[in-house]
Amino acid sequence: MGLLHCFHIHASAEKEALVVAVVWHIEIAPEAGDAFERLYGADGEWTALSRRSRSFLGSSFLKDLAHPERYLLIEYWSEMLVYEKHLADFGAEVQSLEEERARLVVRMEAMGVFSALDVPDRVGPTWSRRSG
């Protein structure tokens, strides 16, 4: 499942957004939790690839407490065009990680691209940065 075709953004909305939040709803296969969390967690391969872009600001990776097979992934980017370029520039690596993800995920839904109205500082446990 490629990412570029999932979002259609009105040009004027893109210009207004200082920080965009790309939001995904993900349901994983039973027993896939540990592997999925390693892939998308702060030290995971997906986050490491995203960090290679100057536009990547961080991510929030959320697990549903009532339904442990459900997750939300929110990636914060400073520019939508650079996000799209990042996906294109690293297409082979993105494809490889998407294939790995396909073995773990039952359903992945692109919820949309949102304008981040109140963004926390780039530190803390919800952001994809680790120190030490």
Residue spans of the language-model regions?
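Short, surface-exposed ligand-recognition loops at beta-strand->loop->(often short) alpha-helix junctions
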Residues: 27-40
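Short, well-ordered beta-strand segments in beta-rich or mixed alpha/beta enzyme
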Residues: 20-27, 57-89
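An amphipathic, aromatic/His-enriched active-site/gating alpha helix that lines ligand/cofactor pockets
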Residues: 2-4, 41-58, 76-113
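Short, Lys/Arg-enriched N-terminal segments with co-localized hydrophobic residues
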Residues: 6-18
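The identity of the second residue at the extreme N-terminus of proteins
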Residues: 2, 20-21, 132
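Acidic/histidine-enriched, glycine/proline-rich intrinsically disordered or flexible terminal extensions
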Residues: 113-132
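Residues embedded in well-ordered secondary-structure elements
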Residues: 13-15, 48, 62-63
